Regions:
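Short, charged, surface-exposed secondary-structure boundary motifs
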Residues: 76, 129-132, 176-181
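N-terminal positively charged helical leader segments and presequences
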Residues: 1-28
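RNA substrate-binding interface of SAM-dependent RNA methyltransferases
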Residues: 28-117
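Structured adenosyl-cofactor binding patch, chiefly the S-adenosyl-L-methionine
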Residues: 153-194
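Short, solvent-exposed amphipathic alpha-helical segments in soluble enzyme
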Residues: 54-58, 134-137, 158-161, 185
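Active-site/ligand-binding-proximal alpha/beta "capping" segment
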Residues: 118-157, 164-169
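A short acidic, often aromatic-flanked loop/helix-cap motif at beta-alpha or helix-coil junctions
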Residues: 104-110, 126-128, 174-175
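Glycine- and other small-residue-rich loops at beta-strand/loop junctions that grip anionic moieties
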Residues: 40-41, 148, 173, 177
């Protein structure tokens, strides 16, 4: 999980606490992936576990729990999430394990990430298309998913002031947070990274 590739090696010798080997060939090159972050309002444990597992399998490189006005679950067990991320990385044969940040307020997230490319799950927009031209190649992509009950009006206004923001409606139905996250990451991966 060092992001440098995968190698095959021949063991030359084994002694107490030491294994000497010779690399014979490279099996996989370093992953050359665009960074995809998932900023999300924490949700109930079972649903959060599913969201983290599937988002890891889909290629998310960083998870950022966001505390909003309407966040119900305010404590996140980072150790539990790290275990899920490792298991999902192994299952999906990833070379790099995603990072998980400590929970941060939406206000601080916006302040720290003014130039970030943010694709915002927005129930109030008519936009159902991603435009590659609005995405800066210099910065990571961040999928931003709101809490149960959505962002407050004030929070939505703050989000929409971000420099590289794309509000996106993915469905006419109101989706659960974990469904919205998985759907948005799939859409981003397919449309912008292919």
């Amino acid at each position: 999980f060092n992001h440098r590739g995968e190698w095959e090696a021949k063991i030359n010798s084994i002694s107490k606490g030491v294994v000497e080997f010779c690399v014979t060939k490279q099996l996989r090159q370093k992953e050359n992936l665009k960074e995809i972050w998932l900023a999300f309002s924490p949700i109930k444990l079972n649903y959060l576990n599913i969201m983290i597992q599937k988002a890891t399998e889909l290629g998310v490189t960083k998870f950022i729990p966001i505390i909003t006005d309407r966040t119900i679950v305010r404590k996140v067990n980072l150790n539990r999430l790290e275990k899920i991320v490792v298991e999902s990385s192994e299952q999906s044969n990833r070379l790099k394990i995603p990072t998980i940040e400590k929970a941060i307020s939406l206000e601080n997230f916006i302040e720290k990430n003014k130039d970030l490319n943010v694709i915002f799950g927005d129930l109030n927009t008519d936009n159902m298309n991603l435009n590659k031209n609005k995405i800066s190649d210099k910065n990571p992509l961040c999928v931003l998913i709101g809490p149960e009950g959505d962002f407050s009006v004030k929070e939505r206004e703050s989000i929409l002031k971000l420099k590289n923001i794309i509000p996106l409606k993915i469905n006419d139905n109101i989706l659960r947070s974990e469904t919205a996250a998985i759907s948005m990451i799939s859409i981003v991966s397919f449309n912008l990274l292919s």
